[in-house]
Amino acid sequence: MARRSKGRQIDGIVLLDKDTGMSSNYALQRVKRFFNANKAGHTGALDPLATGMLPICLGEATKFSQHLLDADKRYLVTAKLGVRTDTSDSDGEVVQTRDINFTQAQLETALEHFRGDTMQVPSMFSALKHQGQPLYKYAREGIEVPREARPITVFELNFIKLEGDELTLDIHCSKGTYIRTITDDLGEMLGCGAHVIMLRRTQVADYPYDKMVSLADLEALVTQAQQQELAVGELLDPLLLPMDTAVANFPEINLPESMLYYVMQGQAVQASGLKIDVLVRITIGEQRKFVGIGIMNDDGLLAPKRLIVIPAEESPE
């Protein structure tokens, strides 16, 4: 017998403003509980030290979370100069202290080194896995694991301010970029060492900063719903962004209602105006109802790749 699903079938994306000191999984579980959702997943972990944007997908939106994992990110980071730690952040042990002695011109030259396409060796204190185990577990045991450099892109690296021994930067980068590693490498280039003392993710893909909500915000709404004897969804669900915002950068193909049945059966259908092997958003009818993503085959057919489950009352007969 199949296990009964617990929680509501609620679909959408919450832009959580994660607090410092908590894991991304803890934040995910709290959001899932607040919404009483039957399924939830986040779109790229933030370190416990870090705060900021953590998109959390609920219900059918989890099918598209990988596309947010692959999206560009933006961070505001403050580094403490003159001190290097074994984790490249303030959670680690100090391994070296040095005097700070560089000019603004030398700083700008160093920053330029990180802009554009580069190769980065991931930190040992990362969630990347080696033989099924996260690197940070090896690091905590004092074991150094060989890591290959990986290609990253830093689209923007902007100097914000330098106050005393604290340097603040704004970084727009590709997926898989480790800000702690950039900070540590920058400190070495400046000859003084550095580590992260504040890290805030300010953007994922094109999601708006002002749409973020904190766990405290959500908890307050849950309490309000209980006090007013309302269903929690009446106050929380309006905060959800549509699930197709996870693939908003994909081209759209709008199909007539008559094709809905065939698409939902996973059948390839005739379509035009699409490039071959490019993922697209599939919408149906005049209301442009999102039903999933597909790809154009070289035989001129649009093949569904990932489809949502449509409620029974909306399913085609």
From Swiss-Prot:
The active site is at 47 (nucleophile). One of its GO terms (biological process) is mRNA pseudouridine synthesis. Transmembrane segments: none annotated. Gene3D superfamilies: Pseudouridine synthase, PUA domain. It is an enzyme of class 5 (isomerase). It catalyses: uridine(55) in tRNA = pseudouridine(55) in tRNA. GO terms for molecular function: RNA binding; tRNA pseudouridine(55) synthase activity. Its EC number is 5.4.99.25. Keywords: Isomerase, tRNA processing. Responsible for synthesis of pseudouridine from uracil-55 in the psi GC loop of transfer RNAs. Belongs to the pseudouridine synthase TruB family. Type 1 subfamily. This is tRNA pseudouridine synthase B. It comes from Shewanella denitrificans (strain OS217 / ATCC BAA-1090 / DSM 15013). The gene is truB.
